Amino acid sequence: MPNSLAGDQVPNPTLDAIGLVDWSLRNAGTSGSTPGLEEGGTDPWTFSQLKNTDQLKEVGTASKLHQVVSGFLKACGLLGSLYFFICSLDILSSAFQLLGSKMAGDIFKDNVVLSNPVAGLVIGVVVTVLVQSSSTSSSIVVSMVASKSLTVQASVPIIMGVNVGTSITSTLVSMAQSGDRDEFQRAFGGSAVHGIFNWLTVLVLLPLENATAALERLSELALGAASLQPGGQAPDILKALTRPFTHLIIQLDSSVVTSSITSNTTNSSLIKHWCGFRGETPQGSSEECDLSGSCTERNSSASPGEDRLLCHHLFAGSELTDLAVGFILLAGSLLVLCVCLVLIVKLLNSVLRGRIAQAVKTVINADFPFPFGWLSGYLAILVGAGLTFLLQSSSVFTAAIVPLMGVGVINLERAYPLFLGSNIGTTTTALLAALASPADTLLFAVQVALIHFFFNLAGILLWYLVPVLRLPIPLAKRFGDLTAQYRWVAIVYLLLTFLLLPLAAFGLSLAGGSVLAAVGGPLVGLVLLIILVNVLQRHRPSWLPRRLQSWAWLPLWLHSLEPWDRLVTGCCPFKAYSNSHMTSKVAHCYENPQVIASQQL
């Protein structure tokens, strides 16, 4: 099946694909079927299409042995692919740090810009995208607050931006499933729900925080009520498993990014070349490095004449610049990540079949019996928080959820609370890490971690507590429906959400608050007006003037993606899917709900 990012040659959705036009108003200049629902097919959001090739027949001893061996090999392959997938994410993060850390340091040094809330938000987003690590971005903020380079009030928008920027990883992972229309629809919608939740929370809490400083005051109250004592480090289970492999590829000096911000040392390399010393240390004890190179980081202060130990990784002693190594690691890690994702998806489709698939889906997506069904989502939040806490990485957890959504194991309604729990889990990890800070920076580190925690907790109260306000779910479905037919929309979404729109807002904020209000105010008002008109078109068209009851009076390119799709398809050498490919699916027994229901355990 071709991996296409161009538009599909199927009935094209208009703006109704994202909920902006009433489907009953088909005189708007375009026509099409309900987004996300194939002709004569099933809705990929509500029905998983895991393939079942099992035959209900008696098998002999040799066949049973073959099945056992095959199942064991598939399980080993799945675990191995998952391991290298996680390692590739770690190396990808290192690559982004090598490519963008110096730029991130330069951005953070402009204190005048950081005092602007909108600029602070954008800086948090861009820096987290550049370094691919919310932990690194948070540690930078903590260091700046502790060194008095940044006030706690100015750090709040940056923390919000860090929360938004970390959702790009799952979106990038979903792109690897663009070869299959239904899988990409579910995977991209699942990754988008995380980013939509973060952006909606920012849109509500940033103005509120700017007006009332609610999060800052709440964190101060929590600090006043607690008796803080420096604690131990947070558990590091996942790193303990992946470090033996990733440290053979690359090792970075994590202190260089922070030191480049709090001081003027900007010429140090992020790559760790020296891991320690042979012989006696200044304290009189000998020091040796193990094969992974994990030992005391004193390479920055070592003099050339000392007998130093070279680290054991591919780029130790290399004369390549950080930028060159970053590009090499970026290309290699992306290649390994895509290969591992393809293997994971194929193995999941092979393993999760028939009764096994139904049992797994039932357990993961099941609700408690009435009247306690509402507790299922909150249990999922706790599970997401706990697993993220154990993995020590929200990016790894969310990136692992996306392929499972693509193959239909986890539905969007269950993945949403898992993502919310992941947000909480990463803040509790940051809180434990803050408690391990030195005494002089303990209060600042804990307050920043508490602000991050209360921000995500407020987001859950806003967009999950009341079921009717769970807006990220329908919005994510609309995005998934749209990208399923126009794959280039996924790239546009990535560029707009994490790069172009933040940079545009950043540029306007540099010109001053009045310029930002003069330009951004009318644009925001226009967007809100369009949303209001489209909601009324869908539900109360009689309330609108006749001219506004449809968008037929506008040029086609203003209310339909079809002209844009023709432009992109003509300019880009992507092969589109054909109508026959999309509509030629045959309903097998494993795609029949009645047959599956009869095979339930």
From Swiss-Prot:
CC per GO annotation: apical plasma membrane; brush border; brush border membrane; vesicle
Membrane topology annotation: Multi-pass membrane protein
Tissues/organs with expression: Highly expressed in the kidney. Not found in any of the other tested tissues.
Signal peptide: none
Residues that carry a glycan: N210, N264, N267, N299
Subcellular locations according to the entry: Apical cell membrane
Regions of this protein lying in the Cytoplasmic compartment: 1-75, 132-187, 346-369, 469-487, 534-601
Catalytic activity: 2 Na(+)(out) + phosphate(out) = 2 Na(+)(in) + phosphate(in)
Extracellular side stretches: 97-110, 209-324, 391-447, 509-512
One of the Pfam families matching this protein, by short name: Na_Pi_cotrans
Disulfide bonds: C275-C311
Major site of localization recorded for this protein: membrane
Function, in words: Involved in actively transporting phosphate into cells via Na(+) cotransport in the renal brush border membrane. The cotransport has a Na(+):Pi stoichiometry of 2:1 and is electroneutral.
NCBIfam families hit by this protein: 2a58 (TIGR01013), Na_Pi_symport (NF037997)
Family that this chain belongs to: Belongs to the SLC34A transporter family.
Protein's UniProt name: Sodium-dependent phosphate transport protein 2C
